[in-house]
Amino acid sequence: MIQEQLAFLPESLPDYRPFPPARERTVWQGLPQRVKDRFLQAGEAALQTPIAPLPLSLWLDFTRTGRRTAWEDAYFSRRARLCALVCAECVEHTGRFLGAIADTVWALCEESAWQLPAHNSYIRDTPQLPLPDTTRPIVDLFAAETGALLALTRYLLPDELDTAAPGITVRMEQELNTRILTPYFTSHFWWMG
């Protein structure tokens, strides 16, 4: 089905640029001061906030009790941290936030799964599996959102990230291919219809 749709696309697509990478300073410097201040304030707060741990016990808490909040609070705080740090670095562009960005990217790449425990099943309305299968990633809304956040981070700060942590963008691309693109193109998920 996807192959059939691809036949209708032109040979090459123009570059899609929702906004420029951080190295293109004119647009970032031209943001309203209140927006830049808000981004910097959030980034500075994120620098002071450690990366939330995601131990197995939090995943198993959902498996055993159905409680979602402990896992999800830590999971979403990691992603909010990365978003705040990236926006702050794009505005300031001095490298002050890059170490924390690299640490947070690494933490996301090291997660066993990007789907939520409540979505850890391959068939709709069936019980969730007790643990994620790292050899068969599930693409749910939140895994896709994580992939989008990492792709956006790589798009905005590619050279800066590789300067701060050589090779980290390669790892990001590997995880995106393994966890999002390959499963999307080779597996069927219930939400695909």
Regions found by a protein language model. Name each.
Residues 77-91, 103-107, 144-155:
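Non-membrane alpha-helical segments in proteins
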Residues 129-193:
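Active-site lining segments of carbohydrate-active enzymes
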